[in-house]
Every structure is written in structure tokens, then in C-alpha cells.
Swiss-Prot record:
It holds the Pfam family Ter. It is found in: Cytoplasm. It comes from the Bacteria. Its main location: cytoplasm. This is DNA replication terminus site-binding protein. GO terms for molecular function: DNA binding. GO terms for biological process: DNA replication termination. It comes from Salmonella schwarzengrund (strain CVM19633). GO terms for cellular component: cytoplasm. InterPro entries: DNA_replication_term_site-bd, Tus_dom1, Tus_sf. Belongs to the Tus family. Trans-acting protein required for termination of DNA replication. Binds to DNA replication terminator sequences (terA to terF) to prevent the passage of replication forks. The termination efficiency will be affected by the affinity of this protein for the terminator sequence. Keywords: Cytoplasm, DNA replication, DNA-binding.
Length: 309
């Protein structure tokens, strides 16, 4: 497929996302809102976009105010829709839930709408990350050449729809991206970097090349069977834990966007019990279960690469 055809599909898919989101928010407002609870988080400024989050103060919103914030959030796709001081790199998150009363017919209609939106979002992300054939550093410029000001994460982020929950509880999750690697795999990656000399601020090209050579030597000095692990921290994430009484099971969802909960009164479902979201404090985390960590030694800090001792 030609680059021109891909751009046409990209723009066409994005227009469909906008249209379907507008239709969904209009449709939701035609339904009876049983309960709504969302939690706004502090604005991340451009100056603080890379700073670790040690505390997060939560503001709760209820009822129609919560619904208005949530429906606007679903359609928040461009930096032009937010304050000039807000970071365009830090994701805008609005955990919470909207609960609507539905019958069998309207439940199916809303399920199909959300499924279609999520399909379009997945297709759009595939075009940018795979079909474009561009490295991650070049994708930003390419997307914004055709869709200026787009917040790509918001365009990718799918909607979560659930049916007839009994209880909904909110909390925070601290995660790491973990990837196990062999010594030879890391050496191969470093070889590729060495073969393409470049400068990486604040280092000159020569300084960066020297840094890579030192890293290569450090990895090459390890035994071939050494166990290496990338353990990169991810910023704390709001989550929702959903309990389904009939199935006697709990399901956990990431909750950067308000969940849409459909309450089917045709089937005798009732309004769920919804909990709050506490302020986040990194110094006061209580772990339900924390397994014994494997002893690790940091070997390449910029890659968050560790070797198991």
C-alpha cells in the first residue's frame, strides 16, 4: 500500500472514531443515569511531566457533574482541548464509572457501539505503530503532520464497558514493564546502536559512542548464561476491581477513563455498590501480597537493565 493510501485510511479512520464517539455520548445521555462517580486528578504541567508521582490528590465528582466530565473526557483527543500549561506527554486520566439503566435491546445497541469504537481505535493504532513502518521516534512527527495536536494515547485508549456489576472498588497499581533477555540478545542490540553513531544530548557523538562501547564491554564480560532483565517502572495507575455476584468472580481493569456500566433491569439487576478512590501516597502503600524479590544488580541504568545475582 502506498504512503498516500495509508494517510487517507488514517484520516478516514480517525474521522470515524470522532463520529462514533459523538454518537455514543449522545446515546448515553438518552438513558437514565442511575449513579455516576468520577475522580479528577491534578493537572500535570509541562515542567513536571517527567517527575515521579509521589502523591496524587483526588477530587470526587458525582451525578450529572460526573457524567458531563466523563462524556467530555471520551472525546478529549487534541491538545487544543486543554490548558496550554498542561503537559501534552502526560496522559490525562479520569478514573470512575457511569451506570446507566438499560433493557435487553438498548444494552445490545450500546455494546455494539462501544465494540465498534474500540475496533476503530485498535485499527488506528495499528496504522501508526505497524503499517507506517516508522521507528517510534519518527511516528510523532508523521501523525502530527496529518492530525496536528492529536493526543495519540487518547486516540488509542479503548473504552471499558461492563454489565451488571455488584460492586466496584477503585485503587492504585504500581507496575513495572519486565522483559527477560539473554546476554547475546543485549549484545546484539548494543551492536546495532554502535553501528549507527549519533549524538544523544547531553553527549556528543564521540562521547555517546564511548558510552555504548563501555556498556558492550560490561555485558560481554558476563557469563553467556547470565540472566538479564529489563525492569522499567511505569507511573502509578488507577484501577477498578469489579465483583460479579452471579458469577462469584472479581475482575480488575485499568481505569484511566470512566467505565461504562450497563444495569439491565429486564434481568433484575440492581444499582452496584461503588467505592471511592483514596489519595495516592507512595510512602504509605499497603501491599496485599508482596513476593520475595529476586536479587538484581543494575548494570545499564539508561535501559533499566539488571543482572540476576
Amino acid at each position: 500500500m502506498s504512503r498516500y493510501d495509508l494517510v487517507e485510511r488514517l484520516n478516514g479512520t480517525f474521522r470515524q472514531i470522532e463520529q462514533h464517539l459523538a454518537a455514543l455520548t449522545d446515546n448515553l445521555q438518552q438513558h437514565s443515569l442511575l449513579i455516576a462517580r468520577v475522580f479528577s486528578l491534578p493537572q500535570v504541567t509541562k515542567e513536571a511531566e517527567h517527575a515521579p508521582l509521589d502523591t496524587i490528590e483526588v477530587t470526587q465528582h458525582l451525578g450529572k457533574e460526573a457524567e458531563t466530565l466523563a462524556l467530555r473526557h471520551y472525546r478529549h483527543l487534541f491538545i487544543q482541548q486543554q490548558s496550554e500549561n498542561r503537559s501534552s506527554k502526560a496522559a490525562v486520566r479520569l478514573p470512575g464509572v457511569l451506570c446507566y439503566q438499560v433493557d435487553n435491546a438498548t444494552q445490545l445497541d450500546l455494546e455494539n457501539q462501544v465494540q465498534r469504537i474500540n475496533q476503530l481505535k485498535t485499527t488506528f493504532e495499528q496504522m501508526v505503530t505497524v503499517e507506517s513502518g516508522l521507528p517510534s521516534a519518527a511516528r510523532f512527527e508523521w501523525v502530527h503532520r496529518h492530525l496536528p495536536g492529536l493526543i495519540t494515547l487518547n486516540a488509542y485508549r479503548t473504552l471499558t464497558l461492563i454489565n451488571n456489576p455488584a460492586t466496584i472498588r477503585f485503587g492504585w497499581a504500581n507496575k513495572h514493564i519486565i522483559k527477560n533477555l539473554s546476554r547475546d540478545e543485549v549484545l546484539s542490540q548494543l551492536k546495532k546502536s554502535l553501528a549507527s553513531p549519533r549524538s544523544v544530548p547531553p553527549w556528543t557523538r564521540e562521547q555517546w559512542q564511548f558510552k555504548l562501547e563501555r556498556e558492550y564491554q560490561d555485558i560481554a564480560a558476563l557469563p553467556q548464561q547470565a540472566r538479564l532483565k529489563i525492569k522499567r517502572p511505569v507511573k502509578v495507575q488507577p484501577i477498578a476491581r469489579i465483583w460479579y455476584k452471579g458469577q462469584q468472580k472479581q475482575v480488575q481493569h485499568a481505569c484511566p477513563t470512566p467505565i461504562i456500566a450497563l444495569i439491565n433491569t429486564d434481568n433484575g439487576a440492581g444499582v452496584p455498590d461503588i467505592g471511592g478512590l483514596e489519595n495516592y501516597d507512595a510512602d504509605n502503600i499497603q501491599h496485599r501480597f508482596k513476593p520475595q524479590a529476586q536479587p538484581l544488580r543494575l548494570i545499564i541504568p539508561r535501559l533499566h537493565l539488571y543482572v540476576a545475582d
